[in-house]
Each structure stands twice: as structure tokens, then as C-alpha cells.
Amino acid sequence: IKSLAFLILFAGCSYDNCNIKTNESFKQITVQNLITDIYSVNNLSSFNSFLLENKNVLYPFYEVEDTSFLLDKVANAFTLIDNVYFDSLYNDVNTHFENPLNLFYPLDNSFTKFNQQSNYKLSPNITILISGFFNDIIVDKENIVIGLDYFLPKTNKYKPRDLPSYILDRYSPEHINSISLSSYLSQFNLINESDLTMINEMISFGKLYYVVSKLLPCTEQRIILGYSEKEFELVNKNEAFIYSFFLQNELLFEESNLIKQKYLSERPSTFEISQSVPGRIGRWLGWRIVSSFMDSSTYTLEELLKEDDYKNIFYNSNYNPI
């Protein structure tokens, strides 16, 4: 596989033919807009009623449970919308997402495409609201709940304060669909949990990235991977070097969680390789391996997600960028 020094655009798609009709009904998803509803809440009692009316999606979103701590949890969540900044946040969301339903037509197309070749028939309900930066996205098999305020442009005055910049960079409008789809499909992405090797986890991440890229063909691969243009260009140019590093340091079959997290977890850089190599590089490498496997595989996307034997993918990938 030749390393690529440019942004990958998948076959059959260019940004010129990615104009998606936004005046049609959704085919696979439903979208519930609670932005105005939550803005209308003006006291703790009405907030509690609002949560109860949408209990199946908002209790999990606000991490509220029917326990003795219920009222404390509700009161704590209410403080995030009962403050002087919430009006500004509401105005910002309405300004930047004038018609928020239009955001999700690519996601609807994704589920349409997936369902056409799958025994799964996935038709989640999407709920959008302003969370006061309580939560970004939660999912279950029937729902995707999105705190739209998390995805305001990076230049917006109000952004979450508890996230480092290398993570916050991914919370932008262009990332909404890829993060939503990745989060949702992760529920169907099987992995052999008894196998502790790094390559097992790398392949699992790679499967998810690959499936999302095929379902969102008009989203740049760097967006799906969560890299900047500069980072994506760098890792593609240095693919052979990065893979050689993994081989020379015998990382693929490493089982130490501490070591694995250096290459799989959120970090500003993978310092062990180079200061300029971004974090989560093991996930990116897993995507390259899975992509090589799928070049000659007859697997459907559903079958790929269900494949929990990394050996089948790894040893049949013929991956060798060196």
C-alpha cells in the first residue's frame, strides 16, 4: 500500500456532487428538536417536568436515575441552564444552526445505505438540545442524543472548559455526523474482549473508522479520524516509518494496558514515536490495516463489524507499507 500525502476522497464522491437535498423527509431517522423546549424551562420544577416528559432520552443524557439521589442530580443539572450564560449559548446555537434538522441528512443517508445491505434495520431517533455543556453525545440502540452546544464553531465565545484543545478541535459542526455515527455504530462493533493484545484493539477501532468512512463518503477521512489536515498529511507521509516503529518495538502483541494507552488513547502527541505524531496513532494504523483487508474482501459492512477475530483481518490484509 502506498502512503498517501493528500486528503483521501473515496471513489464515487467529490465535493461537487455531494449536494444533499434537505427539503425531503428523513427516510431512516427521526429528529426531535428540544432546543426551544429546554430554553423555555424557567425553574427547577419545570426542568424536572421536562426531564420526565422525555425520560427515556434525557435521564441517561443527564445521568439521572430513579434513586434517592434523583433530586440532587436534577438540581445539579439545572444549574447548567439556570445561569446568565445560557441565553447567549441559546442565541449562538440558533445563529450557527439556523435549521438544525439540515445537519442530519447525511446521517439519514448513512443509515439508508447501511440498511440496504444489512440484516440490521437501524432507524434511531435523534434528539438535539442545548445541554449547558453537560454532555456531548449519548447513544443506545434506539437513540442518539446530542448536546448541540458542544459542536459550535471553534471560534465561538462559549465552548466546554474541561476539554484540552487537541480534543476540543474535534467538536465543530463538520464533526457532528461522524462522531454521532461512530458513537452509535460502536454498539454493533464486536471485539474479542478476552484478547488483550494491542492489535486486537487497533483492528476494532479500524473497523469502525472504515465503516463510518463508507457510510459518510462525502466527509473527509481526516474528519472521521479526528485529525487536522496537517496531522493527517503527516501520518500518511510517514506510514512506513510508523508501522516500522510498531514492529521494531514489538507493540502489536503488547498486552500492558499502560503501554497500549500510549498509542490508542487521547493524547496531544505520540511522544514515543515523535513529538509531531498525533495521539491515537494506533487507531489510525488499525484503519489502514482494515482498509487493506477490505480492498480484497467480500465482507459487507455489517459482517465487518461482526468480525471479532482480528487474526482473520490482520493476516489476510496483506498490509505492508514498508
Predicted features by range, described:
Residues 254-322:
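C-terminal soluble interaction/assembly domains
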Residues 14-85:
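N-terminal mature-domain "stem" immediately C-terminal to a signal peptide or N-terminal signal-anchor/transmembrane
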Residues 209-270:
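Acidic/His/Gly-enriched intrinsically disordered linker/tail segments
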Residues 37-41, 110-113, 117-120, 214-218, ...:
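Structured segments of extracytoplasmic/periplasmic soluble domains
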Residues 77-232, 302, 306:
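Acidic/His-rich structured neighborhood in mature extracellular/periplasmic domains
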Residues 26, 99-106, 196-203, 234, ...:
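Extracytoplasmic/periplasmic, Sec-exported soluble proteins
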Residues 75-88, 255-265:
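Short alpha-helical hairpin
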Residues 1-13:
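Sec-dependent bacterial lipoprotein signal peptides
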